[in-house]
Amino acid sequence: MDLFDFFRDWDLEQQCHYEQDRSALKKREWERRNQEVQQEDDLFSSGFDLFGEPYKTNKGDALANRVQNTLGNYDEMKDLLTNHSNQNHLVGIPKNSVPQNPNNKNEPSFFPEQKNRIIPPHQDNTHPSAPMPPPSVVILNSTLIHSNRKSKPEWSRDSHNPSTVLASQASGQPNKMQTLTQDQSQAKLEDFFVYPAEQPQIGEAEESNPSAKEDSNPNSSGEDAFKEIFQSNSPEESEFAVQAPGSPLVASSLLAPSSGLSVQNFPPGLYCKTSMGQQKPTAYVRPMDGQDQAPDISPTLKPSIEFENSFGNLSFGTLLDGKPSAASSKTKLPKFTILQTSEVSLPSDPSCVEEILRESQHLTPGFTLQKWNDPTTRASTKMLEDDLKLSSDEDDLEPVKTLTTQCTATELYQAVEKAKPRNNPVNPPLATPQPPPAVQASGGSGSSSESESSSESDSDTESSTTDSESNEAPRVATPEPEPPSTNKWQLDKWLNKVTSQNKSFICGQNETPMETISLPPPIIQPMEVQMKVKTNASQVPAEPKERPLLSLIREKARPRPTQKIPETKALKHKLSTTSETVSQRTIGKKQPKKVEKNTSIDEFTWPKPNITSSTPKEKESVELHDPPRGRNKATAHKPAPRKEPRPNIPLAPEKKKYRGPGKIVPKSREFIETDSSTSDSNTDQEETLQIKVLPPCIISGGNTAKSKEICGASLTLSTLMSSSGSNNNLSISNEEPTFSPIPVMQTEMLSPLRDHENLKNLWVKIDLDLLSRVPGHNSLHAAPAKPDHKETATKPKRQTALTAVEKPAPKGKRKHKPTEVAEKIPEKKQRLEEATTICLLPPCISPAPPHKPPNTRENNSSRRANRRKEEKLFPPPLSPLPEDPPRRRNVSGNNGPFGQDKNIAMTGQITSTKPKRTEGKFCATFKGISVNEGDTPKKASSATITVTNTAIATATVTATAIVTTTVTATATATATTTTTTTTISTITSTITTGLMDSSHLEMTSWAALPLLSSSSTNVRRPKLTFDDSVHNADYYMQEAKKLKHKADALFEKFGKAVNYADAALSFTECGNAMERDPLEAKSPYTMYSETVELLRYAMRLKNFASPLASDGDKKLAVLCYRCLSLLYLRMFKLKKDHAMKYSRSLMEYFKQNASKVAQIPSPWVGNGKNTPSPVSLNNVSPINAMGNCNNGPVTIPQRIHHMAASHVNITSNVLRGYEHWDMADKLTRENKEFFGDLDTLMGPLTQHSSMTNLVRYVRQGLCWLRIDAHLL
């Protein structure tokens, strides 16, 4: 029938108040629809998109005219439309509806039939349910309607196509259509109840989903009841809800939700689309899920769904209380005229509508509505649920129940409990009917049935085959419309769910129990469920994230999921394709954590809830589980076994989702526990383990609060991880079904960790005590201590590794006490220092073998503590100390100097020699002073050198009696004993020799240096140990670039200049390497030339000539001048051969031209020489010469000109070199002491010094400058 003809012919005011008319119309329309759909399937199967545009886009004025005519019939609705400005929305009628309405002959009868049919269901449902919802619910619904109008239209658009697909499918298969009708009507009821405004939009969706609308007839009876409630509360609201869509279609869709005929009002084209939808399983799934299930699930739709969930649950919950009466009052539908008006446009095939309505009647309308609510609510609430999940855990769900259902929350819960027994008896009969009826029996799975009807016989076959399974699967699918793969198992789950729900609803509380199941969580559950549908997998991953190993181990240890596997295997086959959907749906059912349970258990969720219901936490799941019980009865023995394992397997659900329904079921339980345990693990890993070991009921109940709190976060995290994490987790969960072993393993793991930690703690305590007790232990003890610490350090590391491995259970971390952790940290640092010290020890100094680990720790810790204290007392910048390093080299062999030196321990020197900078040039900076700076303690540990202003007890390295003379902050010259000092000095001398031989940086023992040198300044100045190894030019180039970049990053001019000078030294070394390697592409002359420019730039940063210039600036200028001088001289030497050539060539040229020059009076002739004399140059000008010359001006060849210029440039280098040298000499007079020490240490620098000597000399001076300026 033509949809518009239907609207036109449909007299909204004419009300078919009698069930007889409805039944007759149903039958007729169903038959017609089946015929038309079958005929049109081929025609439209491939020619039309699932979701067509509004007719208006195609029809234009014609459509507008039809719509106007239709609207003209709605006298009562006009005011509402005008007032609420819904006309625009009503105008939007799906495109496909018009072209797809080729069967006009059905219009007259179809419209009245549908009208009668639609209206009575509304009235029937309205009468019982109208009184049911409190006026407040109605108000909320009306308000929601307003809010949903906006979101619903888009959703309805999406729904139109799905509904069309469903309609065609429904016509193709009456049973399916019935199921679909129930689902859609249920969804519509949800939408309607959720939001009257949404209902118009839903109406559009229903229009798109003719089957859904047909389904909505029984469901619409409940929905109509709700609408009637709205009407009773405020007729305008109900009308508004109907008209809210703003288009006749929408209005009709509103009615369609109530009577489902509006769904049939869709033209055969829509049905053909339905057939196309069949081709596209995704479309099926979406219609099944709800109006918003259109492949395009717009966020608007989801929000509207969320509103529906919250409000729809309220109204629906309210309806639940009166749903049984609503079912009985289907005959009373005539009362709800406005709803009929809104529905007028939807159904296009009266016979199909009739059949669908009948089937939907068979199915408990309330149940269908509930299912619809669940899918739509879930779909919309998935996103919200992630957010809500934090607060929408079972605790939140209960408040939400109260909020959404207000009075009905408790009623719903009670109804659920009541419905459980009823559902159990009812479900078997419903499941018992034909396989399609089994789908109907799924009732709540109407959405899945719709999608299934979209999939036509395929869905039906499987749904009938796996009624119980499909019941569970469809429910899972309901939360989210899934792609075709999910259609079958979603439908199956829906069927199973619907079956249980239908049974419960049939019992009289069937609607209420199912609604209660979804409603107890009402808003939150759908939202949470949908959020979990999205986050369920994610939640599962969330737990893995928090405790991936724990969950894996637990799930692996759990065999229970396998027990559920037999039952779930069949579902798995279907669910395998729709595993994602299942998980989502399950999530939708379950609340934050329970949703996950349900996700894995969805198929088995119903039986499981019975067990879970025992736990307070499982209250929602209990409500959900009650219908599952019905399923259990339907599925017979399978549910019961699942129930038992599920409590044990809360963790499994995450992983089960992906593995399959069977496994998912136990996992859902496990997952619930996992969530709680996860939250607990967040709180306390051990607790989570214990909780997991505890029966699931205990875990879910006891841990619910924690898990709820954590679940929110987990959900968010898990949402990210949902797909991948849930898949992996599911697999693990299956393996982990027996979580009891997991806790044991975790506990064991934790216990070792704890033991290790305790041991570490004990050691730390011992170290602290020893540090305080024995700050000056003998070096001998210290020496053994180092190796011991090494071993101990390695042991703690191993333990740490174990802890890290075991950390999947965060118990270890949580068990760490702050104090213990604090103790461990220093201990670790000490160990690291010890290890570094040992590594740094010269080959000659072998660390003493570990003798007493505790003692060693004590000695090392005390030694280190002393060092740290000393270092703290004496800041690393030791500018006063570094003066005597040069002498230290000479006196390194003298024991007395070292022993007497109060400022330094030889060990410090020895270890300091170790720390060699990669630069190799400036690496020489001693750790204590230049290298370590603020890091002296750390580097001291590595270099075992800690230089302090008053002499630091670095005493770290000793061959046998390791140094650590415990020259504490005071670092007395005797260093505890003369023997110790002697040993230290001997060792240091040996070590230094070895280090020097190995070209390691040598730290001149500052203590020894002062004795050797009369000046204390020399003693204090450290000497850099330079690496004699030869590197290629690239190595030096890299070093130079590093220093240059470092200088570029500095803002302080002096530090910048020093670093530029240091970089220039590296460039100089690079040039020197180029000289050695003739294959170098770049000329060393060029490198030197560029280095000169860099030095000159560095000198410009500080005006040493200024009266305000500091001694440091002048010292730096001296070093730069020395360097420049030698560089210039070196450049001259490199070009000396060229200069000689140029000189000879020029001399020859002048000789050849001597005769000519003699003939011409010129200054050259005046001197009688080839070279001009100053007198001749002064007396004779070129002009005079030219004037005297008859031949005219003398031309010089270009070659000679270039040669002369090159000759001048080369020879000028010598001049510059000497000039800079003289400048350096002048400035040196102002700092004789500094440069005297430098000359003494490094040897005097001359103009004939090699580039290597120059680099080392200047670098040593720069090091001292850094120390003086505290730049190290």
UniProtKB/Swiss-Prot annotation:
Location of this chain's protein in the cell: Nucleus speckle
Record bears the keyword Phosphoprotein: yes
Chain intervals with Basic and acidic residues compositional bias: 151-160, 543-558, 616-629, 818-829
Region (Disordered): 93-183, 201-225, 283-302, 418-491, 535-687, 779-829, 842-903
Biased amino acid composition, Basic residues: 630-640
Residues the record lists as Phosphothreonine modifications: T478
Official protein name in the record: AF4/FMR2 family member 2
Stated family: Belongs to the AF4 family.
Function summary: RNA-binding protein. Might be involved in alternative splicing regulation through an interaction with G-quartet RNA structure.
Organism the protein comes from: Pan troglodytes
Modified-residue entries (Phosphoserine), positions: S391
